[in-house]
A protein has these predicted regions:
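Prokaryote-biased recognition of long, low-complexity C-terminal linker/tail segments
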Residues: 148-202
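Charge-rich, well-structured scaffold segments of protease-associated domains
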Residues: 1-164, 221-362
């Protein structure tokens, strides 16, 4: 996963291996992790080719079922090094790499094996490891010894300083053609880059847009299967549609969010319902694994208890004027003019003047 400083846009990429086990099987779990990290055969050409074909197929299936999140991530990658890294490791950018290697495996297999071995030595180092462990007090006793066994088998520290990886972003505004007859339409941007600030009421806005404006205009009137939005602490925001028969019409709906918010008026009962809906999303019951993931993510992303309390207070005390004030945030997001659409060849060709690049996805 990525690790982002919540008040900044710096990020550190991490490689994660995780598992669950009953207490008597903890030694077996850690032994399996150690074997996977340190003893995997990275030079098995036959197996590598099989994995590449499997990855290519799975990514294509993912783009068809989750094209809305894929297009949003791709659009965000035009202006965010963090999102570009995500796209390069789990999005369209990654798919293009996998496809290129799989289709020219004989020419590229030696370089692939060399890169995998080099990455393993750089990542699985004794000075580069962190563990997050969730259990009852009874389960804490064996963890130190088990962790020490893994740590003792990792690669040694690297000599000299590491060279930072610099990711270059550029606006591409792509339309990706597929055999599908529906579109996944994304409009994104970083509102902090364009002068706005994060506020807890943006979490309420997600609920309002999903159940009112976007629902009525994209789903009910437009015929899309779904629509959603998101806004995070580092300023990234998006508006997306799911299995949408439209393209240009949906983009026009996104542009209308600003005027909708400027004129936002509801009665106190509806406002309370929006707040309750927002809090219910935040206060979901969590099993131990979910609690462990959340605690690690908050720690690694430098999200303090004070930041959580502030956001919660802003949500609970939000009024209609706070929602109307968010028009400036959405307007700032739209100023980025970053779009990406995955959809039918016919629809994308019909609106090709909207894009900087039009290409076939698969």
């Amino acid at each position: 996963p990525d690790v982002t400083k919540a008040k900044e846009k710096d990020f550190r990429a991490t490689f994660e291996i995780k598992g669950k086990a009953l207490y008597p099987q903890m030694k077996i779990l850690f032994a399996m992790m150690r074997e996977i990290l340190m003893e995997s055969r990275l030079d098995d050409e036959k197996r590598l080719k099989e994995i590449l074909a499997m990855l290519k197929s799975r990514l294509q299936m993912s783009f068809q079922s989750s094209g809305h999140t894929t297009s949003a991530l791709r659009a965000l990658s035009y202006g965010s090094p963090l999102s570009k890294f995500k796209d390069d490791t789990d999005g369209i950018g990654f798919y293009e790499v996998v496809r290129g290697i799989e289709e020219h495996f004989e020419e590229k297999k030696a370089e692939l094996i060399q890169n995998l071995k080099q990455l393993s030595r750089q990542i699985f180092r004794v000075d580069n490891v962190m563990i997050s462990y969730t259990s009852s007090e009874d389960g804490l006793t064996p963890i130190e010894a088990a962790f020490r066994e893994i740590k003792d088998t990792l690669y040694p520290e690297l000599d000299g300083e590491e060279t930072p990886c610099v990711l270059h972003c550029r606006k591409r505004n792509e339309g990706f053609k597929t055999s599908s007859k529906v579109q996944y339409v994304a409009r994104v941007g970083n509102f902090i880059d364009h002068g706005a600030q994060y506020h807890g009421a943006l979490q309420i806005l997600k609920v309002i847009l999903s159940y009112d404006y976007l629902w009525q205009n994209v789903r009910v009137k437009g015929g899309a299967y779904g629509c959603m939005s998101n806004f995070n602490r580092i300023g990234e925001g998006y508006l997306i549609s799911y299995r949408d028969p439209n393209l240009k019409k949906t983009m026009e709906v996104y542009e209308g969010v600003v005027d909708y918010l400027k004129n936002f008026t509801v009665d106190e009962r509806d406002m309370t319902k929006y707040i309750i809906g927002t809090i219910s999303n935040i206060d979901r019951p969590m099993n131990p694994a979910a609690k462990g993931d959340r605690s690690m993510n908050l720690y690694m992303n430098h999200v303090s208890q004070e930041m959580i309390r502030t956001e919660r207070s802003q949500i609970l005390h939000a009024a209609q004027e706070d929602i109307r004030a968010l028009a400036a945030v959405v307007e700032a997001m739209l100023k980025a003019e970053q779009i990406c659409v995955i959809g039918s060849e016919e629809k994308i060709e019909e609106e090709k003047e909207m894009f900087l690049e039009v290409k076939t996805l698969f």
